[in-house]
């Protein structure tokens, strides 16, 4: 599997010099593409436009970016610091709270992937001690430690009951809970987002109480602690469990450096590692930018979104660790094809043309290319070649033919696109339930995640392929639903203005007569419910294989990425209006400056 996934040790040593060589089978070139073939129709058709702006990222500029703080010297320094951090984890003299805070810092600083075994061993030990002692949080000083332990254990797949908060819940319900420990309240708030549907007290008591207390704190003009106030604002804006990990790492590095008790070794290790990982991401980005330019799709199809950087940004949210560069590159190609085909169905194609394209994808027969309108031929040929190429790589190195499953995922996607196109063309207004039955697939998450499974898994299971292909993996449906609803909340005003099919908010309004505000609140609650379901899926994940846990984490990361991308509007289609440009700049372009004399 060395060709598909280079070992982490090799990546760490050669982040700047290694170039992936993605071997592809011979490309099929249809003769009809080598000559000008006019469309059969002579009727001038009225085509819609998405009014998308050109890419804010110039190809030549992307090829020029580099991180000057990620040289071989920095790699050596990082590895020295890594040993020091490992000794902190191995220190048996640390208290329970010190252990928990160190793990939390490593995770938020984006370096926990170096210490997965050590972290799992520590959490396993803490979980066993918790089970033996059967203790509950009944003191103010325990609030932060208990909340943090609950969140970290559940996040890592350990089964922990909400009953450890029973004493505090009783005090909240009787209005006798008094505390000035805002850090403990923030930890309690963050812990509440690891809830499942059965955790009624986390939902109905702890989360509303903690949210109210944090709001009072940030609204208090007498609050002097700027560090804690920023932390509180950040939590209220979006809980940590729902945030895109890598973007939050960039925020937390700056926040951690301002802490009065920050650890100098830890912050320098995190900053150097961030730059080294960023350098790996920059090489990925250059590769996919070259690929995108070589497809000529933006020249041939000027109506589609030119968003290769944004498509790569999604993959960093999906899996950021440097050793997974091959996966990020493949998934960026998948994302770019999804975006292109979505625009053909959403904006440009007539129903007759879209039915032809759907049939072509279902049959997967490149010899029928001439039946398509000319503007669709290049798109289908690139889809055909790329998916067959991915399947060929997997067959060579993993000894299983996944092409039937991959092509089915594209056929399913195109069929749902076609349903929405028919709804729009015919002015049909579906109920929310009918809309969601189609929309959780049309948002492309099932297509994305089956490709991710195939390139990520060392041992591909036919049973897993079947359940993914037949849309029977519940965590995929939950992730897809969050993606769909977040997309609807962020994009529906723009899409409705150009005349698209109703989205979830409008379906609910049309069906119930609710106001837009109430409808949006309902959609937000649907998102929260899906997170509860995903939390249930991972509640006992510590008993699963690392690859199984990795797939579930990727599904959750896709949901996290969607809430990042659509947090301030359409961050994918209109990145200039939704903070995407600034976020990409901070993650993929701008390095973190280093003080070479700081460590002495």
From Swiss-Prot:
Induction remark: Not induces in aerial parts by treatments with jasmonic acid, 6-ethyl indanoyl-L-Ile, fungal peptaibol elicitor alamethicin or herbivory.
GO BP: diterpenoid biosynthetic process
Binding annotation for Mg(2+) 2: 342, 346
Intracellular or extracellular location(s): Plastid, Chloroplast
Organism whose genome encodes this protein: Arabidopsis thaliana (Mouse-ear cress)
Cofactor(s) needed by this chain: Mg(2+); Mn(2+)
Enzyme nomenclature, EC number: 4.2.3.108
Entry annotated with the keyword ATP-binding: no
Cofactor note: Binds 3 Mg(2+) or Mn(2+) ions per subunit.
Taxonomic lineage from the root: Eukaryota, Viridiplantae, Streptophyta, Embryophyta, Tracheophyta
Protein name according to UniProt: 1,8-cineole synthase 2, chloroplastic
GO CC annotation: chloroplast
Transit peptide: first to last position: 1-31
Job of this protein: Involved in monoterpene (C10) biosynthesis. The major product is 1,8-cineole (52%) followed by minor amounts of sabinene (14.5%), myrcene (13.3%), (-)-(1S)-beta-pinene (7.8%), (-)-(4S)-limonene (4.0%), (E)-beta-ocimene (2.7%), alpha-terpineol (2.4%), (-)-(1S)-alpha-pinene (1.9%), terpinolene (0.8%), and (+)-alpha-thujene (0.6%).
Presence of the UniProt keyword Iron-sulfur in the record: no
PANTHER family: 1,8-CINEOLE SYNTHASE 1, CHLOROPLASTIC-RELATED (PTHR31225:SF244), OS04G0344100 PROTEIN-RELATED (PTHR31225)
Keyword tags: Chloroplast, Lyase, Magnesium, Manganese, Metal-binding, Plastid, Transit peptide
Example of a GO MF term: magnesium ion binding
Activity dependence on pH, as recorded: Optimum pH is 8.0.
Pfam name, any one: Terpene_synth
Residue sites binding Mg(2+) 1 per the record: 342, 346
Binding-site residues, Mg(2+) 3: 487, 491, 495
Family affiliation: Belongs to the terpene synthase family. Tpsb subfamily.
């Amino acid at each position: 599997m060395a060709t598909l996934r280079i070992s982490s040790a090799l990546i760490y040593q050669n982040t700047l010099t290694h170039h992936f060589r993605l071997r592809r089978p011979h490309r099929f070139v249809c003769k009809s593409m080598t000559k000008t073939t006019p469309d059969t129709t002579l009727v001038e058709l009225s085509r819609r436009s998405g009014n998308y702006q050109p890419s804010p990222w110039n190809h030549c500029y992307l090829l020029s970016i580099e991180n000057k703080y990620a040289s071989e010297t920095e790699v050596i320094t990082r590895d020295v610091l890594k040993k020091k951090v490992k000794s902190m984890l191995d220190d048996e003299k640390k208290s329970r709270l010190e252990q928990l805070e160190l793990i939390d810092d490593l995770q938020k600083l984006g370096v926990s992937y170096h210490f997965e075994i050590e972290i799992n061993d520590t959490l396993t030990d803490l979980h066993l001690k918790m089970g033996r002692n059967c203790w509950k949080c009944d003191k103010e000083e325990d609030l932060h430690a208990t909340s943090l332990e609950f969140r970290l254990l559940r996040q890592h797949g350990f089964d922990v009951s909400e009953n450890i908060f029973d004493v505090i819940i009783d005090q909240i319900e009787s209005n006798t809970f008094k505390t000035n420990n805002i850090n403990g309240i923030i930890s309690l708030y963050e812990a509440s987002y690891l809830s499942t549907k059965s955790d009624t007290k986390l939902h109905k008591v702890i989360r509303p109480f903690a949210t109210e207390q944090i709001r009072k704190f940030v609204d208090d003009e007498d609050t002097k602690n700027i560090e804690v106030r920023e932390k509180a604002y950040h939590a209220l804006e979006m809980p940590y469990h729902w945030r895109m990990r890598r973007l939050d790492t960039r925020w937390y590095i700056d926040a951690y450096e301002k802490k009065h008790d920050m650890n100098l070794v830890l912050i320098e290790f995190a900053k150097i590692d961030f730059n080294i990982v960023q350098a790996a991401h920059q090489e990925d980005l250059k590769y996919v930018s070259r690929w995108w330019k070589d497809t000529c799709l933006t020249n041939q199809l000027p109506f589609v979104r030119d968003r290769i950087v944004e498509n790569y940004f999604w993959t960093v949210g999906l899996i950021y660790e440097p050793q997974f560069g091959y996966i990020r590159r493949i998934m960026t190609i998948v994302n770019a094809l999804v975006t292109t085909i979505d625009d053909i169905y959403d904006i440009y194609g007539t129903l007759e043309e879209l039915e032809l394209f759907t049939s072509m994808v279902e049959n997967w027969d490149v010899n029928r290319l001439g039946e398509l309108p000319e503007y669709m031929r290049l798109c289908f040929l690139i889809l055909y070649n790329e998916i067959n190429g991915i399947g060929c790589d997997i067959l060579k190195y993993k000894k299983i033919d996944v092409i039937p499953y991959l092509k089915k995922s594209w056929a399913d996607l195109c069929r749902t696109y076609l349903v929405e196109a028919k709804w729009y063309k015919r002015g049909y207004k579906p109920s929310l339930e009918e809309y969601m039955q189609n929309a959780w697939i049309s948002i492309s998450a099932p297509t994305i995640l089956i490709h991710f499974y195939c390139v990520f898994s060392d041992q591909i299971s036919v049973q897993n392929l079947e359940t993914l292909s037949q849309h029977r993996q519940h965590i995929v449906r939950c992730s897809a639903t969050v993606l769909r609803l977040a997309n609807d909340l962020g994009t529906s005003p723009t899409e409705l203005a150009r005349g698209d099919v109703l989205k979830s908010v409008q379906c609910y309004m049309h069906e119930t007569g609710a106001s837009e505000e109430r409808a949006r609140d309902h959609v937000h609650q649907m998102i929260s419910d899906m997170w509860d379901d995903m939390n249930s899926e991972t509640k006992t994940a510590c008993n699963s294989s690392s690859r199984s846990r990795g797939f579930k984490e990727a599904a959750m990361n896709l949901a996290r990425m969607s809430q990042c991308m659509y947090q301030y509007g359409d961050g994918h289609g209109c990145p200039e209006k939704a903070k995407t440009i600034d976020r990409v700049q901070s993650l993929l372009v701008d390095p973190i400056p280093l003080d070479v004399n700081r460590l002495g």
